[in-house]
Each structure stands twice: as structure tokens, then as C-alpha cells.
């Protein structure tokens, strides 16, 4: 069978706490699928509670991919996801099964469907220099530095968004040009012709009432805290080789608990920060989803939302 004759790959996207995992598992009961995780936090081993990782029973009920694949000391890029996902789609189809992509890391989705921008590769020396500078001056100071050389990028980043500030400054140091200018130039030159529309069917879980989703987020974070999130972070800290500069420890929820264990805040403040950070993540995910014209929107609060997803998927 040629690539063109395959049905589109269904991508079930949505913000945190929108019911993606539950919907995916119900869909798996209807169709012989294998799930490809589109989640930058689920790739890490030893990080189960704060990532809302599917349970062992759920993982055993249907094949899952790109979960528990790296150590928290390591990093996993959008480029790696793109390569892995494309390979997995082919392998799953070769087994006579249906790939189902599920998650909320929109950068991964963009990489898979539109390709990656040709930006300079990460440079360990430059990153170490920026980390040292941040340790001395703080990330808001580096954000101010970024504003001087790339005001467009700086304007869309929070002063404490360490990972993105570091990447933008790294690109400027390596290329001598603002990241925003490089991205704009590459967008103008891109020959991508909209293959995402043909190869992927995007189903987006979007709440009709954001307040309900916000309440879910608070309840879920409380459940994580009661379920052992603090103890999970304590085990990560006990390793001795992890720190707040790593993408794994900067994951929403983990960072706030880590800072709490550092003595930076009390329990109530940590809880508030964790919920607020999760809601901010949700807001960014929804903004990105709603800027995706090819999506099929489904109200994740509707009682029959799983049936609607199945209909949209053609299953």
C-alpha cells in the first residue's frame, strides 16, 4: 500500500486535564490502535505522578510508544520526536494496526506536520556560559539581554522562561542574528505545501467552559500531591545529579515542588504556584490549538465527547 493510500493519522490533541488519555483508551477498545505519545514530559522515566502518566494497567491494555524512553538527566528534542514518530507510524501500519497520536506538546505536533526550522544546533559550551550567567544574575537579567538583541522574541517570553530565553540567546550568539529574524526568513522561504492537511487528521479537545477545566486542574494537582508527588520529587533529588536547570525538572509541577523542598516557599504557596503554572500551560496549549485551522474541535466537557471524537476520526 502506498503512503498516499493510507488514511490520515489521527492526532488527538488537547490541553492538560482535557481527558485525552481516557478518550484514547476508549478509542483503543473500538479499533486496533497503537498510541504514540505527543508529550514532552511522559518521555522521562522515574516521573510518573506529576506527569499524569498512564497507569501500568492502562499501558498494558494498548501498546504505547515514546513513554519512559529517557532518563531525567537527558533531553529529548522536537527533532528526535519527529524522527521517532515518523518511524513508528510506518512500523505500526506494517503490523496492520492504526497509529493514534495523543498529547498536548504542540511543538512536537508542529515538527511532525510542518518540519523543523533550520536553526543552529544546541551548543553545550554556549549553554554552560548562559547557565553560569543566569546563576550569577538571574533569568530576568538574561531576558533583558535578549530584549536588546531580539525584542520580538523577548516580548513573547516570560522573564523566568529559562529554557526559551537560553535557546534564543544561544541562537543569537551562534548565528549573530535574532531568532525571530531567522524564523521569519525561513517561513517566507518554506516550500511546505500543507501536507498536514492530507496526512494528519487533527482532533482538538477544547472546553466550552474554561472555568470547569481550571477546577479540574486544581483537583488534579491536589490529587497528585496526595498521591505522592512530593515523595517522587524527593527521590529525584536524592539521586544527586539532577537540578532545576534540566528540562525534566522544569516540567510543570516538578519545578514548584523542587523549589518548595529547597525552602523557597511554604506548602500553600507551592500548591498555588503549581496550579497557576498548569493553568498557564493550558492557556498556551489552547491558544496554539485555536491557531491550527485544520483541527476538528470537540467540546471535552460534553458527556458524549468520546463518541464525537470517534466520529471525527472516522472510527
Swiss-Prot record:
Catalytic activity reported: adenosine(37) in tRNA + dimethylallyl diphosphate = N(6)-dimethylallyladenosine(37) in tRNA + diphosphate
GO molecular function: ATP binding; tRNA dimethylallyltransferase activity
Pfam families: IPPT
This protein's record includes keyword Transit peptide: no
Record's keyword annotation contains Acetylation: no
Cofactor: Mg(2+)
GO biological process: tRNA modification
Annotated region described as Interaction with substrate tRNA, given as residue ranges: 39-42, 163-167, 250-255
Residue positions binding substrate: 16-21
Residues that, per the record, bind ATP: 14-21
This protein's UniProt keywords: ATP-binding, Magnesium, Nucleotide-binding, Transferase, tRNA processing
EC class (word): transferase
Enzyme Commission code: 2.5.1.75
Site (Interaction with substrate tRNA): 105, 127
PANTHER family named among the record's database cross-references: TRNA DIMETHYLALLYLTRANSFERASE
Primary role: Catalyzes the transfer of a dimethylallyl group onto the adenine at position 37 in tRNAs that read codons beginning with uridine, leading to the formation of N6-(dimethylallyl)adenosine (i(6)A).
NCBIfam families cross-referenced by the UniProt entry: miaA
Subunit architecture: Monomer.
Homology family: Belongs to the IPP transferase family.
Protein name: tRNA dimethylallyltransferase
Lineage of origin: Bacteria, Pseudomonadati, Pseudomonadota, Betaproteobacteria, Burkholderiales
Primary gene name: miaA
